[in-house]
Amino acid sequence: MTNKKQSASSQRWLKEHFDDKYVQEAQKKGWRSRAVFKLDEVQSRDKLLRPAMTVVDLGAAPGSWSQYLAEKVGDKGQVIACDILPMDSLAGVDFLQGDFREEAVLSALLKRIDGKNVDVVLSDMAPNMSGNNSVDQAGSMYLVELALDMCNQVLKKNGAFIVKVFQGEGFDQFLQDVRNSFKTVKIRKPDASRARSREVYIVATGYKL
């Protein structure tokens, strides 16, 4: 019975996935995933990305955000990306594979960044979901806290932070922590974010060095 339920659920997910207009549009335009449209909507509204910027992309695989970032910052910009999963190489993207939670990986990432010269830190990280809501929420909040800590180590004064956060326990405190570090903080729910998902994007600007 369980296998039948899982099979039916999987079939529904696959149908929804391939019927999804954002999936179809991503395939048509050569983007690696539909997630690019979430970032594009944030960029359309907040205009944070410009040529020659240095940006850090956390949770980068399969790479649609890095693709988009490389286009926006251009040849004179720099995209430094990290993910625990492998990612096929992209022109203009310096990719580091490893677990961002491990000290050695964090140190290697900081070495590539080389000082407080980052204009924007972006995080689309999410933990492997276990199905236990409280465990999954704690894991996701830990990742966003690490991303905020990365901002404190590498962001320029007045730099920006775009981070995916799941609403739930710990969200309000994290939002306050971000407000303590940035002058302006907005919450975005892009159209490309599935309605049933608890994910939102915190968009913070004006980093207080």
From Swiss-Prot:
The active site is at K164. Its main location: cytoplasm. Specifically methylates the uridine in position 2552 of 23S rRNA at the 2'-O position of the ribose in the fully assembled 50S ribosomal subunit. Keywords: Cytoplasm, Methyltransferase, rRNA processing, S-adenosyl-L-methionine, Transferase. This is Ribosomal RNA large subunit methyltransferase E. It is found in: Cytoplasm. It is an enzyme of class 2 (transferase). S-adenosyl-L-methionine binds at G63, W65, D83, D99, D124. SUPFAM superfamilies: S-adenosyl-L-methionine-dependent methyltransferases.
